[in-house]
């Protein structure tokens, strides 16, 4: 929202402009100019980096920042309260705008924290490749039950010989001359899994011996992808220990590594000629999968031949960090946890709470008007929530794969045949004989060299779509894999992580050639995503581990306090800080962090504050002038709005709203959007037990994304005045936001938004009214404004009515890339190459009949309808100022919103843009008085 249109009508009080110079009376302005040569006040009276050049009597006046330690603290289950005594000495002025809370504590982000995609363990392994493993097969014979141990895997380390001592890996030639003592593998860590043949060349024809390691049947099988077992010795060995019973009676039980050797010979070897070719060192290890899970499991967890084919998938990334600008950390708008700023002489609290003020959102929009939110500022944790536009709106322009991509075997040829050398017989020119000068075994390949083709571009694009779009589809589109048990609580990380989705829902051929967002994804919060760059940055500021000793600096946001000049006296300043991890922390998956084990504790909260580095006589003059009630400090809330939440039941389409009769003086208009009930906490309570969510909170941080669900809004005052005038495209008193069927051509920009609504938004945001369409100036087009976030889209789909050969083939019966992809699952490819039966071609000579679909998205911003007294002038838009009908009488207001149905309860978030100001008066030492004025909704004060 652009700054100028966001500010109230200044004429109501003695405020003249947007910077703090407008807060001052002419006398104070004159004083500032007179002292400007040796102390520049600048905006908001402060320039704390410039020290005075003369008249300074103490070194304390030069000190820029002081630390206040709390005089009292309360550490409760859900909150942490601190109280400070601010002693402002004579001839000093404390700048509240420079204060911040310096907080130290310990954060446990819980087991659901995973700050990266993929796995850190064996990430190059195929998803379905097992570790070298063993399993037991039980056979019921006629007379007895037999059990056999089966092994699958690889022995990679070459040795000189295999004896009962194991694999010989070398010789000790330092013994007596002529003797060579064999060196055998140290079974605690050898053969090492990372050691094998150094080259592909092995054509000498000798029968080598090999050794390797294998997991015993007692260690449950897991795919190699994601497998980790902690080392149990400094050489990297991983075997567990096993108990060894004493050999003598009364002896002590000991432990040894749980490692055994198993020897293997070729299957064709016969008794009497058996000799070991392979030895496997089998062991039990502490096998775990810290960052992956199984998505294909043919049987139960017991080891079996079928379970060799288990398939792994990495756990979903879940960044967890403090919210943007520490949203949610400090209590605002909460009756039971209201802050206090009171003079100790009067004990009047200058912080008056109004439930319908939104301090956090106001601060977000204020920052956006001041600077570039895309530039991060780590001190205040300023890294705005964002999303990858390519994920929200998919521009599927296909893949550039004109040339095939090959991969080749390591020797560049592939497996060959073994040939012996021959030559022409010397006595017979037509015969052949063995050539003794040529080796008897020559490996030669015929024909072209072996190659495999992989479409790298297609695989990258398909993988991007699955990881970034398909996995974030609503849960109704997902399923739980067979033989996998997930918790019943759908808000937990384990549940969200374990659910999988068919890649066919979001494949590379879906909407190919179109710029379109998936319809089921439109109502999914796009900021709850691992590509939320701001959240990722804030998460990484804390580090990459679960347990964090944090040290943060948090600013005060309440508009009546944050810019105050505190005059000499003694004051009580206290505030509450939340300990609810769902409110304080943000996760990219939005899981319930309370259930998933995250905790936060504070060890200290100190206050840092700055005194103006003024000369004493300058400060005393400033104090004398500010004590005068004509020089009260006035501040207005940037948003200057009363916010109201109206529930919208699931599948409802109409929301009527009534505001009782009142005088609408100083009213500036409406802003509105839609929120999900699940994503909106109750700010009035100290702890909301029903808030089981930790993603972005649009109500507080401005991550709105449901604006496209509004269809119409009708506004009627009881005076029955058709206030918007009669020169608009549509009927007065009704704004049509989008039209599905547009026979008259009222829509704009190749989408279903009406020209009427587009112009109203341009007018409300940039003052670009009915005089045409043009791009707003850069300084007005901020991150939260309309034009930057307006995204029109259109696509063609098959005309199911007029295309006579159309068949509605459902997802299980569609095939495309058959034989090269898994069937309805992110698992091993299956099937056979065959012509695709989906989608129908929309281009070329065989293009089928199609219809055009249009829509738009407009995230982050709020829809705005400006209001002026001129609208009450019976339809004529004039510049004659306030109409008497409007200014001197009260009116009731009825509004009706028409919205798209959603299958979950939502809220209409409606801002009445009013005049929200506080005047702070400090007549005597230790006395602070505040008067809040907000017409036409409410007012309050701290003077009685």
From Swiss-Prot:
What domain of life does the UniProt record list for this protein's source? Viruses
Listed GO MF terms: structural molecule activity
The modified positions for Phosphotyrosine read: 932
Q: Which residues carry this modification: N-acetylalanine?
A: 2
Cite any additional comment in the entry.
Answer: All late proteins expressed from the major late promoter are produced by alternative splicing and alternative polyadenylation of the same gene giving rise to non-overlapping ORFs. A leader sequence is present in the N-terminus of all these mRNAs and is recognized by the viral shutoff protein to provide expression although conventional translation via ribosome scanning from the cap has been shut off in the host cell.
Please describe the quaternary structure of this protein: Homotrimer. Interacts with the capsid vertex protein; this interaction binds the peripentonal hexons to the neighboring penton base. Interacts with the hexon-linking protein; this interaction tethers the hexons surrounding the penton to those situated in the central plate of the facet. Interacts with the hexon-interlacing protein; this interaction lashes the hexons together. Interacts with host dyneins DYNC1LI1 and DYNC1I2; this interaction might be involved in intracellular microtubule-dependent transport of incoming viral capsid.
Q: What does this protein do?
A: Major capsid protein that self-associates to form 240 hexon trimers, each in the shape of a hexagon, building most of the pseudo T=25 capsid. Assembled into trimeric units with the help of the chaperone shutoff protein. Transported by pre-protein VI to the nucleus where it associates with other structural proteins to form an empty capsid. Might be involved, through its interaction with host dyneins, in the intracellular microtubule-dependent transport of incoming viral capsid to the nucleus.
**What name goes with this protein?**
Hexon protein
Record the organism: Human adenovirus B serotype 3
């Amino acid at each position: 929202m652009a700054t100028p249109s966001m500010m109230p009508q200044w004429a109501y009080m003695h405020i003249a402009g947007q910077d703090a110079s407008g807060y001052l009376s002419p006398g104070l302005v004159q004083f500032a100019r007179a002292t400007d040569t040796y102390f520049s006040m600048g905006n908001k009276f402060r320039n704390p980096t410039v020290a005075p050049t003369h008249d300074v009597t103490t070194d304390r006046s030069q000190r820029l920042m002081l630390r206040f330690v709390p005089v009292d603290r309360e550490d409760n289950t859900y909150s942490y309260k601190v109280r400070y005594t601010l002693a402002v000495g004579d001839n000093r002025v404390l700048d509240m705008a420079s204060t911040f809370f310096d907080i130290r504590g310990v954060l446990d982000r819980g087991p659901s924290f995973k700050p990266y995609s993929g796995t850190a363990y064996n990430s190059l392994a195929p998803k379905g490749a097992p570790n070298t493993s063993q399993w037991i097969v039980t056979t019921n014979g006629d007379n007895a039950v037999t059990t056999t141990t089966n092994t699958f895997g690889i022995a990679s380390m070459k040795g000189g010989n295999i004896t009962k001592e194991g694999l010989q890996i070398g010789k000790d030639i330092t013994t007596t001359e002529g003797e060579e003592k064999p060196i055998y593998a140290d079974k605690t860590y050898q053969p090492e899994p990372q050691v094998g043949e150094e080259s592909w060349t092995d054509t000498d024809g000798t029968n080598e011996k090999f050794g390797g390691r294998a997991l015993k049947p007692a260690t449950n099988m897991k795919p190699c992808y994601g497998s980790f077992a902690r080392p149990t010795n400094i050489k990297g060995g991983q075997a567990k220990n096993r108990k060894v019973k004493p050999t003598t009676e009364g002896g002590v039980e000991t432990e040894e590594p749980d490692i055994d050797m198993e020897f293997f010979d070729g299957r064709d070897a016969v008794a009497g000629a058996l000799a070991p070719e392979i030895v496997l060192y089998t062991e039990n290890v502490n096998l775990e999968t810290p960052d992956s899970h199984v998505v294909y499991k043919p049987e139960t967890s017991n080891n079996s031949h079928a379970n060799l084919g288990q398939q792994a998938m990495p756990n979903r990334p879940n960044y967890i960090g403090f919210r943007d600008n520490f949203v949610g950390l400090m209590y605002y708008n909460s009756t039971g946890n209201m802050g206090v700023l009171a003079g100790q002489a009067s004990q009047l609290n200058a912080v008056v709470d109004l439930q319908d003020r939104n301090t956090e959102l106001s601060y977000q929009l204020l920052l956006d008007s001041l600077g570039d939110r895309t530039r991060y500022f780590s001190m205040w944790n300023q890294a705005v929530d964002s999303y990858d536009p390519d994920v929200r709106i998919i521009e599927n322009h296909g893949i550039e794969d004109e040339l095939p991509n090959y991969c080749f075997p390591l020797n560049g040829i592939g497996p060959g045949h073994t040939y012996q050398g021959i030559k022409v017989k010397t006595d017979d020119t037509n015969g052949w004989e063995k050539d003794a000068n040529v080796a008897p075994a020559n490996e030669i390949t015929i024909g072209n060299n072996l190659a495999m083709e992989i479409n790298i571009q297609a695989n990258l694009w398909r993988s991007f779509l699955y990881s970034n779009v398909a996995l974030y589809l609503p849960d109704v589109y997902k399923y739980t894999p067979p033989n996998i048990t997930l918790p019943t609580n759908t808000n937990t990380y384990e549940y969200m992580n374990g659910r999988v989705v068919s890649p066919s829902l979001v494949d590379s051929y879906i909407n190919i050639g179109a710029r379109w967002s998936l319809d089921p994804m439109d109502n999914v919060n796009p900021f709850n995503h691992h590509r939320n760059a701001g959240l990722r940055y804030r998460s990484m500021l804390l580090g990459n581990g679960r347990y964090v000793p944090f040290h943060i600096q948090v600013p005060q946001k309440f508009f009546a306090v944050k810019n105050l000049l505190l005059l000499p006296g003694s004051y009580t300043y206290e505030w509450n800080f939340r300990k609810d991890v769902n409110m304080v922390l943000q996760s990219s998956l939005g899981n319930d962090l309370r259930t998933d084990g995250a905790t936060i504790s504070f060890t200290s909260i100190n206050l840092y504050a700055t005194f103006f580095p003024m000369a004493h006589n300058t400060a005393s003059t400033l104090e004398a002038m500010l004590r005068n009630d004509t020089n009260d400090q006035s501040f207005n809330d940037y948003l200057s709005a009363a916010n109201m939440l109206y529930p919208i039941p699931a599948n409802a389409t109409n929301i009527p709203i009534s505001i009782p009769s009142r005088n609408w003086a100083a009213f500036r208009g409406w802003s509105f959007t839609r929120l999900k009930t699940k994503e909106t906490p109750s700010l009035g309570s100290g702890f909301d037990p029903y808030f089981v969510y930790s993603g972005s909170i649009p109500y507080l941080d401005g991550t709105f994304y449901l604006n496209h669900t509004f269809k119409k809004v009708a506004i009627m005052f009881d005076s029955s005045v058709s206030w918007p005038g009669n020169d608009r495209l549509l009927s007065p008193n009704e704004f049509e936001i989008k039209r599905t069927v547009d026979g008259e051509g009222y829509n704009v920009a190749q989408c279903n938004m009406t020209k009427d609504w587009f112009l109203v938004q341009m007018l409300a945001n940039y003052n670009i009214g009915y005089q045409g369409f043009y791009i707003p100036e850069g300084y007005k087009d901020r991150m939260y404004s309309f034009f930057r976030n307006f995204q029109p889209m259109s696509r063609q789909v098959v005309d199911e009515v007029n295309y006579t050969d159309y068949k509605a083939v459902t997802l299980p019966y569609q095939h495309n890339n058959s034989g090269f992809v898994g069937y309805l699952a992110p698992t091993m490819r299956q099937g056979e190459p065959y012509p695709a039966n989906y989608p129908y071609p929309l281009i070329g000579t065989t293009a089928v009949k199609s219809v055009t679909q249009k829509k738009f998205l407009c995230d982050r911003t709020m829809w705005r309808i400006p209001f002026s007294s001129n609208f009450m002038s019976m339809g004529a838009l004039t510049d004659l100022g306030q109409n008497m009908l409007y200014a001197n009488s009260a009116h009731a207001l009825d509004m009706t919103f028409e919205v798209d149905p959603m299958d979950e309860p939502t809220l209409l978030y409606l801002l009445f843009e009013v005049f929200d100001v506080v005047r702070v008066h400090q007549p005597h030492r230790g006395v602070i008085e505040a008067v809040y004025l907000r017409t036409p909704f409410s007012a309050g004060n701290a003077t009685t």
